[in-house]
């Protein structure tokens, strides 16, 4: 759990940086369009849509913008050619990387993703080369650890698979199928999460103890997330305490 918490801190910091770049709106709109297209326009019955709508609202996207994106999805406008494609590869130090994209032009996306790996001494692999190292699961996080007992009671009753508690975070883990039900149960109990999403979680970790390698891994993640077609980047990296302190400096 400590590794999750440390990496989460970096993710949260990066999320703020990404928002300042102004690209997060485009990525959320694409996700809303696709989620609505695949699962319908009602967030109450579409957990994927509900999760991204909550994220969009958290970065001050207007309801009008969100609703227009939902209508684009269910109406099939402008997104018929948008495809979800996942790329796999390795960064330095044997770090496994999954890159989820939404693209209307594979001839643009593939070279862009490959360039990010090659510029940071990594390698873009073939389908299946690292996917087996990750498991799809729901993650619902709370920063208020004083709510541990109540969260545990509600989440487990609603079908959560596991709950991990650190000194600064509670992580509720669900299957992708029960994610929405557990999220609803927690919300109904007055427990507002700080983040909720279905992710690809690594089953093993690649620890990086060298600061130069750590910087290359972070550069790879930054470069990938800067690509317009990239929606999510998942890795199995775990930085040592010493490296993390230097990255945070």
UniProtKB/Swiss-Prot annotation:
From the record, give the cysteines joined by S-S bonds: none
Instruction: List the subcellular locations.
Output: Cytoplasm
**This protein is called what?**
Probable transcriptional regulatory protein ABAYE2155
Which species is this UniProt entry from? Acinetobacter baumannii (strain AYE)
PANTHER family named among the record's database cross-references:
TRANSCRIPTIONAL REGULATORY PROTEIN YEBC-RELATED, TRANSLATIONAL ACTIVATOR OF CYTOCHROME C OXIDASE 1
GO molecular function per UniProt:
DNA binding
Q: Name one GO biological process term.
A: regulation of DNA-templated transcription
Supply the alphabetized keyword list.
Answer: Cytoplasm, DNA-binding, Transcription, Transcription regulation
The record ties this protein, via InterPro entries, to: Integrase-like_N, TACO1_YebC-like_2nd/3rd_dom, TACO1_YebC_N, Transcrip_reg_TACO1-like, Transcrip_reg_TACO1-like_dom3, YebC-like
What's this protein's family per the entry?
Belongs to the TACO1 family.
A Gene Ontology cellular component where this protein is annotated is: cytosol
